[in-house]
A protein has these predicted regions:
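Short acidic DE-rich linear segments
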Residues: 80-85
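Glycine-centered tight beta-turn/hairpin loop motif at sheet-sheet or coil-to-beta transitions
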Residues: 29-33
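Intrinsically disordered, low-complexity regulatory segments enriched in Ser/Thr/Pro
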Residues: 34-71, 77
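Negatively charged, low-complexity tracts enriched in Asp/Glu with abundant Ser/Thr
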Residues: 1-28, 57-70
Length: 85
């Protein structure tokens, strides 16, 4: 049975890991950031954010564009789409 571990393994193989601590893994690929929440070595969800620059202030920010909390073929395809951009 496929689980969130499958999607996290996909991120580990295709995106650059930026941070890791006991309850969060972060990956970066192009303009997208992936935050993986874990609880006692069990993955609970993936948050996908997009990096943007404010028009006038030139500040860098992040906007959450998607969240994934279970493995499905549709979610697998969504992750792949973000990794290919």
């Amino acid at each position: 049975m496929e689980t969130l571990n499958t999607l996290v393994d996909l991120l580990k193989s295709k995106a650059k890991k930026t941070t890791e601590d006991e309850d969060l893994l972060e990956f970066e690929k192009g303009k997208y950031f992936f935050g993986v929440v874990k609880n006692k070595n069990k993955y609970e969800g993936i948050t996908i954010s997009r990096k943007f620059e404010a028009k006038y202030s030139k500040r860098i920010g992040f906007k959450i564009i998607d969240t994934i909390d279970e493995y499905t073929e549709k979610n697998h395809a969504r992750i792949m789409r973000y990794l290919e951009d």
